[in-house]
Amino acid sequence: MEKLAELGINIPSFIAQVVNFGLLLGLLYLFAYKPILAKLDERSARIKESMERTDQVKEQAQRAEEEFKKKIGEASQQGQLVIERAVKTGDEIRQKAIEEARAEAEAMLSRARTEIRQERDEVVDQLRKEFAELTILAAGKVIDQSLDKKAHQALIDSVLENSTNLRKN
């Protein structure tokens, strides 16, 4: 102990300091260390909970994004179907308009042909009548007598019919 005294260490003072240090450690343990550890544990739990919530939010965001992409894909497909239907309907309407125009043109051509045929027949009949009258007049002048118009007309019609039949063949 003397050696400790030579070094300047006072034993009663040293013991008092060790006791004081032990008491201080005990008090700090009770009043500071436990509350600090409790606060740290609480903070750790909050951080862990926040991390879990963050993971959940990320998962929800990912699911929402996938659902959004899926809905966009479905909307795109529906849009394509609508476009295809519209194109098909447009083609059908165009085709129908073409067919109606074609039918109308054919009907107009048919009417025009019928009218032309009727007018031609009328002109031919009129020419026959005029030709017959001219023939009667000419024949009457040539023989200086007037023939029976009905008999002469029948003769001219017969000649004209024969000439028309010859032209058709």
Swiss-Prot record:
The keyword Isomerase does not apply. It is a single-pass membrane protein. GO terms for molecular function: proton-transporting ATP synthase activity, rotational mechanism; proton-transporting ATPase activity, rotational mechanism. InterPro entries: ATP_synth_B-like_membr_sf, ATP_synth_b/b'su_bac/chlpt, ATP_synth_F0_bsu_bac, ATP_synthase_B_chain. The chain crosses the membrane at residues 11-31. SUPFAM superfamilies: F1F0 ATP synthase subunit B, membrane domain. The keyword NADP does not apply. Pfam families: ATP-synt_B. It is found in: Cell membrane. Keywords: ATP synthesis, Cell membrane, CF(0), Hydrogen ion transport, Ion transport, Membrane, Transmembrane, Transmembrane helix, Transport. GO terms for cellular component: plasma membrane; proton-transporting ATP synthase complex. NCBIfam families: ATP_synt_b. Belongs to the ATPase B chain family. PANTHER family: ATP SYNTHASE SUBUNIT B, ATP SYNTHASE SUBUNIT B', CHLOROPLASTIC. F(1)F(0) ATP synthase produces ATP from ADP in the presence of a proton or sodium gradient. F-type ATPases consist of two structural domains, F(1) containing the extramembraneous catalytic core and F(0) containing the membrane proton channel, linked together by a central stalk and a peripheral stalk. During catalysis, ATP synthesis in the catalytic domain of F(1) is coupled via a rotary mechanism of the central stalk subunits to proton translocation. F-type ATPases have 2 components, F(1) - the catalytic core - and F(0) - the membrane proton channel. F(1) has five subunits: alpha(3), beta(3), gamma(1), delta(1), epsilon(1). F(0) has three main subunits: a(1), b(2) and c(10-14). The alpha and beta chains form an alternating ring which encloses part of the gamma chain. F(1) is attached to F(0) by a central stalk formed by the gamma and epsilon chains, while a peripheral stalk is formed by the delta and b chains. This is ATP synthase subunit b. It comes from Dehalococcoides mccartyi (strain ATCC BAA-2266 / KCTC 15142 / 195). The lineage of its organism: Bacteria, Bacillati, Chloroflexota, Dehalococcoidia, Dehalococcoidales. The gene is atpF.
